[in-house]
Regions:
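Amphipathic alpha-helical coiled-coil/heptad-repeat segments
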Residues: 89-133
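DNA target-recognition domains and sequence-specific DNA-contacting regions of bacterial/archaeal
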Residues: 1-90
Length: 133
């Protein structure tokens, strides 16, 4: 599983400086994350930089919703040619932004509820421990 959204370490230079999408090439193969920061991609991380004024959040959601056929044996991996062969729709940017805005808000609500559930589970565990000691 990805920790810290796949971020690891620090650098004093950057290879990617604008909005982009990273896609994991190994491990959690094909998992896309929209990036709005400067970074240096390492190991098996594929970086996608839009050629047009597209919404990277929208395309990260689209990639995550797309089945990508992984043909490797042994350790699964995703290569640039495999990812490049995936065809996606490209709606107008205004529609991309509306869709991604809705999905980002939904994800924020889901994360908030997940944090609440974790807190409630800790309270329950604490209460059970106190009840049965």
């Amino acid at each position: 599983a990805l920790t810290n959204s796949g971020l690891y370490g620090y650098a004093n230079y950057f290879k990617i400086e604008g909005d982009s999408i990273t896609v994991s090439g190994r491990g959690e193969v094909g998992h896309a994350i929209a990036r709005h920061c400067k970074y240096v991609p390492i190991v098996r991380l594929l970086s996608l930089v839009p050629k047009h004024d597209d919404d990277v959040d929208f395309f990260a959601y689209m990639i995550n919703a797309t089945s990508i056929y992984i043909e490797s044996t042994g350790v699964p991996q995703l290569t640039s040619p495999q990812l490049g062969a995936v065809k996606v729709l490209r709606p107008p940017v205004s529609e991309q932004k509306r869709i991604s805005s809705f999905l980002l808000k939904l994800d924020a609500k889901i994360e908030k509820e997940e944090r609440l559930i974790l807190r409630m589970e800790k309270v329950k565990a604490s209460m059970l421990q106190q009840l049965f000691i």
